[in-house]
Amino acid sequence: MNVLLPQPIETEAISLLEEKNCIVTTAPDPKPETVLPLLKDAHGLILRTGITINRELIEHADELLVISRTGGGLDNVDVSAATEKGIIVTSNLGVNTVSVAEHVLSMILALSKRLILLDNAVRNGNFGIRYQNLPRDINGKTIGLLGFGRIGCEIGRICHQIFDMQVIAYDPYLPDGKKAEYRSWVTFAELYELLSKSDVISIHVPLTDKTRHLVGDAEFSLMKTDAILINASRGGVVNETALVKALQNNQIAGAGLDVFSEEPVPADNPLLQLENVILTPHTAALTKECVTRMATEAAKCVLDVFDGHEPQNVANPQVLESGRWKRLQADRSSQNC
């Protein structure tokens, strides 16, 4: 079976595939025009974030059985087109939870303690900045979580248990029964209430039509002037123009961004000129340990499909009822007899 990698993945995952006699092809680059001809013979595709697998590409993938995302998001896959084609789409929900949570907490602390500003001051001979008392504690403060899935929950847990922070969450999609499990330490509230009461606001929602520009001018006007905003979900959730204005006008104290509306970030993006922002290049989940976990789990999903087994975290379970999937299962079952 042929497995296509639009971008390189960890050697541990490639070894896993090759041990099962898969032929692994890595594209020279993740451009659509490069990947398209390689899709013709691919049975499995392991996908990172460097390319969007759109309808046009999927229509050329006649042999493709599975698209396996290394991460949890599916905004770079046309799931509807894949479903129509009978292609299983899987994601890696939960695999990057701890790594992303650690990254977010690092940003919260770095912004609150003004680490980058103080580091630059010392390097430039301004040791006297210590008398300005710029750092702030987070202990006992309030963190607001936009989205209370795995990552949001983990960040809230750490902030509550370690820093004695009050936790407010906004998640209209979380069932009431599930919310009840957390009410001993989480207050679920409407968005406006969360924004007005939180000292730290951290975003953990997927990018959809409903969440695009979820945070804009109106939302920034509700925030405390000493609040900090963290976004490690998707760039489009925050209106960057409104964010720049809020930072320039001191509507909020600072922001930590791992994601952007356009990636890579253009050289003329005004965020690059602001001192009250920490920017990282979409690396919250890209620790050595996490990328290995994500790649190997994505490879396991591909192998499960090849073996006729239902993989984990199927985004389009209706494909499992299709004739194509039933025939694959029957074929693999007969081979094992």
Which residues are covered by each model-predicted region?
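Rossmann-like dinucleotide-binding domain for NAD(H)/NADP(H)
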Residues: 89, 226-337
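Short glycine-/small-residue-rich Rossmann-like dinucleotide-binding loops
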Residues: 50, 72, 199, 205-207, ...
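Rossmann-like dinucleotide/phosphate-binding beta-alpha-beta segment
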Residues: 132-225, 336-337
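An N-terminal-biased, well-structured beta-alpha scaffold segment characteristic
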Residues: 1-90, 196, 216, 222, ...
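Beta-strand-loop-alpha-helix segment that lines the small-molecule cofactor/substrate pocket
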Residues: 58, 62-65, 77-89, 203, ...
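Phosphate-binding beta-alpha-beta segment of Rossmann-like dinucleotide-binding domains, i.e.
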Residues: 85, 93-142, 154-158, 162, ...
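Structural/interface elements that position substrates and couple domains in central-metabolism enzymes
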Residues: 2-3, 22-26, 97, 168-170, ...
